[in-house]
């Protein structure tokens, strides 16, 4: 199916078959579509509304074309979210990755520079002294040695270069926001995924179900946050043993006091790093609480505990004893060794 035919199909409000979506994505990712065609495709698809089947098919293509990280670790976890929630909070899921590693997990943290926020995961990790420009084998060594490694999306998804310009110029959320958490180059089967809109909470869980994921928590809070919120109830769709369960969690269930999201807001990468370090230094407050909530959910998703509450308590313990902070410093040191070699 040629791109104009794809556009006509979408403009008529019709869904693409999985095979048509895969064919279209392969054209886009191999330079077979013009920037105008890519932009038109993304907007037409969003206006029609992406289906679970379309998103799963697109993710399959990006997974095929990614530069893989050859990690063989059971329960390998990612904490990459869709972004695009416009909350301007510090890097919560990135901070949580070090907490999960300290709790005994293996984390393949997939991320990039900021698109819609003020500090992307790559931005804050680089500011923390971590070398983000590692080879797949070097990332593998970090994960196997320390329990955590950073997979810089731009290095692993080279084919995305064709969509970067149109995506940036459009300046609105598109299919690619949904694809970020679905295309981990290490193939992490366990995930905590934040999503920018409530209808995609169960939708993304269904996509990951189709893609064969093992244990996943997809979350979106009523205040709009693409994390488990300290300020409002959070919708969770949990994929486990092939089944999806929907429920809500509230911070007070786990002994946390609600706090305004404004207390977690940052306007620079440096401010995000300061807040991250404060959490890992066990400074009390809403930043530490929201990381404990989300890291606890990730620990549970990584099958390190048998309940969300037990995961949260484990997260609090490894923050308090300094082992989570030690993981951040160890990754900075090891990644810089690679840069020097």
Curated annotation (Swiss-Prot):
Chain positions recorded as anthranilate 1 binding sites: 81
Keywords: Amino-acid biosynthesis, Aromatic amino acid biosynthesis, Glycosyltransferase, Magnesium, Metal-binding, Transferase, Tryptophan biosynthesis
Family classification: Belongs to the anthranilate phosphoribosyltransferase family.
Subunit structure: Homodimer.
Recorded catalytic activity of this chain's protein: N-(5-phospho-beta-D-ribosyl)anthranilate + diphosphate = 5-phospho-alpha-D-ribose 1-diphosphate + anthranilate
The protein's name in its UniProt record: Anthranilate phosphoribosyltransferase
Cofactor (UniProt): Mg(2+)
InterPro entries linked: Anthranilate_Pribosyl_Tfrase, Glycosyl_Trfase_fam3, Glycosyl_Trfase_fam3_N_dom, Glycosyl_Trfase_fam3_N_dom_sf, Nuc_phospho_transferase
NCBIfam families: trpD (TIGR01245)
Binding site for anthranilate 2: 167
Organism, scientific name: Methylococcus capsulatus (strain ATCC 33009 / NCIMB 11132 / Bath)
Top EC category: transferase
Co-factor: note: Binds 2 magnesium ions per monomer.
């Amino acid at each position: 199916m040629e791109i104009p035919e794809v556009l006509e199909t979408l403009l008529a409000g019709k869904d693409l078959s999985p095979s048509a979506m895969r064919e279209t994505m392969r054209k886009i990712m191999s330079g077979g579509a013009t920037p105008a065609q890519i932009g038109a495709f993304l907007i037409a698809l969003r206006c029609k509304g992406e289906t679970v089947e379309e998103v799963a098919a697109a993710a399959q293509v990006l997974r095929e074309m990614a530069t893989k990280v050859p990690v063989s670790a059971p329960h390998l976890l990612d904490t990459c979210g869709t972004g695009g929630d416009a909350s301007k909070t510090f890097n919560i899921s990135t901070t949580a990755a070090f907490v999960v590693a300290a709790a005994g997990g293996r984390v393949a943290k997939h991320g990039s520079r900021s698109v819609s926020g003020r500090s992307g995961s790559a931005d804050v990790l680089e500011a923390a002294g971590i070398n983000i420009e590692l080879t797949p084998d070097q990332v593998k060594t970090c994960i196997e040695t320390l329990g955590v490694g950073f997979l810089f999306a731009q290095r692993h998804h080279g084919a995305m270069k064709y969509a970067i310009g149109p995506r940036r110029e459009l300046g609105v959320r598109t299919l690619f926001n949904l694809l970020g958490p679905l295309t981990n180059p290490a193939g992490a089967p366990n995930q905590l995924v934040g999503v920018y809109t409530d209808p995609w909470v169960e939708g993304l869980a269904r996509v990951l179900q189709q893609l064969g994921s093992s244990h996943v928590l997809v979350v979106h809070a009523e205040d709009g946050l693409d994390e488990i919120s300290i300020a409002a109830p959070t919708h969770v769709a949990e994929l486990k043993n092939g089944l999806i369960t929907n429920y809500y969690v509230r911070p007070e269930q786990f002994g946390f006091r609600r706090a305004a999201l404004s207390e977690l807001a940052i306007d620079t990468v440096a401010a995000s790093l300061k807040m991250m370090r404060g959490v890992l230094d066990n400074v009390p407050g809403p930043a530490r609480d929201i990381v404990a909530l989300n890291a606890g959910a990730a620990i549970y998703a990584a099958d390190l505990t048998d309940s969300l509450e037990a995961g949260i308590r484990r997260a609090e313990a490894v923050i308090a004893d300094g082992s989570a902070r030690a993981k951040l410093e160890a990754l900075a040191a090891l990644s810089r060794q690679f840069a020097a070699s």
